[in-house]
């Protein structure tokens, strides 16, 4: 049986110089004040973040649908048909529930099981929310459609008691001023992943819990910029650091710092990107100038989707029109045509 000492673990990791630096930078962005756009425009940014969380978290687990079907599901409210489509909508429902209840919902066993239940409800209403009844494995899904085992989690007959103890210790830590809450969140998530309490869908539930705990403890990043999207973009690092931190976990000899530092860097990256998005939209300048600024600031070829994400308050047609004019004027280069168009500054 695994025994936790969450408080001491968090306090020890919080003294790591890299952790201290990351937290300091996160708090800098977390404390910044912005002139936020009106509610309608801000809702667009929230909807984009939510959709990206849904698609990214599922893609990490090998669940994907094409863009046309995705648009139909999210924009036209078309009923899901395949298991993949139902998985996306189930995750979306769980995420919407989190945004509704996080201010008053406490972290407990019932809530965690309910997130799993929502995740699976459209596929098999009797599957989600039930603790595992057979040994499961943490697997990394590779681009060639194969997978590899990263870690062997807690045994089924030890799962309930182990998770209950983890939840109790997490809530107990909240009252101790010495415990850094960001570090606490990611130590908890690391332990949750090592327990892997459900037969399937644990990775998705861990990302739902990440969103919930960040919101609950005052970090509203995921409301406007998806951490799951950033994890997907750095998925190799995710599994590498999870594997490093899980070594010796069953014997209480694991080093959580690898995973915690990785997740803190994800949060910092998200805050930086959100800061850039809001600062660009604060500027009182023509759309053409904003697009030139975005492409000029990028040190890489930037996609039309990236430009649309930053200029969330502008219509797609308007952005496409300006991009076309800038190409004709020779101010930017079109490096790739079609669905995945890429643009770069013309030096």
Task: Pin down the residues of each PLM region.
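FIC/Doc superfamily catalytic core
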Residues: 1-347
């Amino acid at each position: 049986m695994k025994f936790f000492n969450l408080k001491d673990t968090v306090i020890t990791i919080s003294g790591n110089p890299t952790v201290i630096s990351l937290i300091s930078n996160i708090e800098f962005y977390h404390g910044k004040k912005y002139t936020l756009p009106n509610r309608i425009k801000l809702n667009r940014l929230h909807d984009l973040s939510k959709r990206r969380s849904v698609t990214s978290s599922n893609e990490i687990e090998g669940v994907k649908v094409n863009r046309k079907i995705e648009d139909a599901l999210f924009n036209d409210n078309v009923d899901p048909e395949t298991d993949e489509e139902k998985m996306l909508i189930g995750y979306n429902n769980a995420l919407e529930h989190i945004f509704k209840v996080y201010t008053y919902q406490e972290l407990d066993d019932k809530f965690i099981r309910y997130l799993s239940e929502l995740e699976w409800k459209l596929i098999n209403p009797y599957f989600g929310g039930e603790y595992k009844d057979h040994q499961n494995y943490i697997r990394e899904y590779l681009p060639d459609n194969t997978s590899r085992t990263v870690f062997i989690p807690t045994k089924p007959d030890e799962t309930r008691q182990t998770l209950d103890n983890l939840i109790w210790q997490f809530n107990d830590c909240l009252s101790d001023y010495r415990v850094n809450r960001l570090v606490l969140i990611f130590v908890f998530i690391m332990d949750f992943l090592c327990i892997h309490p459900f037969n399937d869908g644990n990775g998705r539930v861990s990302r739902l819990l990440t969103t919930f705990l960040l919101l609950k403890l005052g970090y509203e990043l995921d409301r406007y910029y998806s951490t799951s999207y950033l994890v997907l973009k750095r998925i190799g690092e995710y599994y590498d650091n999870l594997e490093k931190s899980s070594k010796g976990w069953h014997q209480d000899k694991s080093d959580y710092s690898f995973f915690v530092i990785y997740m803190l860097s994800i949060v910092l990256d998200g805050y930086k990107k959100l800061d850039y998005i809001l600062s660009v939209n604060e500027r009182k300048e023509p759309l053409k100038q904003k697009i030139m600024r975005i492409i000029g600031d990028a040190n890489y070829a930037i996609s039309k989707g990236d430009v649309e994400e930053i200029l969330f308050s502008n219509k797609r047609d308007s952005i496409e029109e300006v991009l076309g004019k800038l190409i004709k004027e020779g101010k930017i280069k079109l490096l790739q045509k079609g669905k995945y168009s890429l643009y770069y500054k013309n030096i």
